[in-house]
Swiss-Prot record:
Keywords from the UniProt entry: Acyltransferase, Cytoplasm, Transferase
Name listed for the protein in its UniProt record: Aspartate/glutamate leucyltransferase
Top-level EC class as recorded in UniProt: transferase
GO biological process, one term: ubiquitin-dependent protein catabolic process via the N-end rule pathway
Entry keyword Hydrolase: no
Amino acid sequence: MAQPDDAALPFSLLQFYATSPYPCSYLPDREARSQVATPAHLIDSEIYSSLIRTGFRRSGIFTYRPHCDGCKACVPVRLPVTELRPNRSQRRAMKHHAKLRVRELPLVYIDEHYALYNRYQQARHPGGGMDEDSHEQYAQFLLQSRVDTRLIEFSDDEGIRMVSLIDVLDDGLSSVYTFYDPDIPDASFGTYNILWQAAQCQALGLPYLYLGYWIANSRKMAYKAMFQPIEGLIDGHWLALPKLEKT
């Protein structure tokens, strides 16, 4: 298996800097730092694909990875999609939402999407700051991209149920962000979305679905451990993590 090599990154083109410490969004009473790749306008899809393989992620036009002092809790993870074996509840979610209508749309602002985003943030992440995002903050976070990004809308006869942002890489898809209707209990939209994205990887002949970071002691991240098999980037090497447990 090819391993990422930081020495092979385009350092001649990019510069990397560490941010000042800020409160960690996932582990209470901890501070986080990020390493940011700049300048943003030079990070095209090819370079971004290389950065993803070394643990970077994207938020708007900013590409970053954790760079925390004395903490390595954030583990970049990806699914090898041809090996993915959904469990019973995951198969049930796929069947339950099989009739959702799926549309790929331009990366533009849509009032209904922003309204759904606000409802999702207020229900799932109250008090986290994003539940107060303005139109401009929403657009900067999700609708600004310098790489190959797809906006996917899922709907039924009652309206829009879920919106997902996906980046296309040279070896897979990267799940950027997903928000969905929070008012339907036990809908498992998130589970369905990951399996749908994995199926899209297979349809495109791409081997991996990148899911961002998994943190053992963060409930927000626990769902990622439910998809097996899964690989994690440990000390610069992508390794199978067969014993991840839901926490």
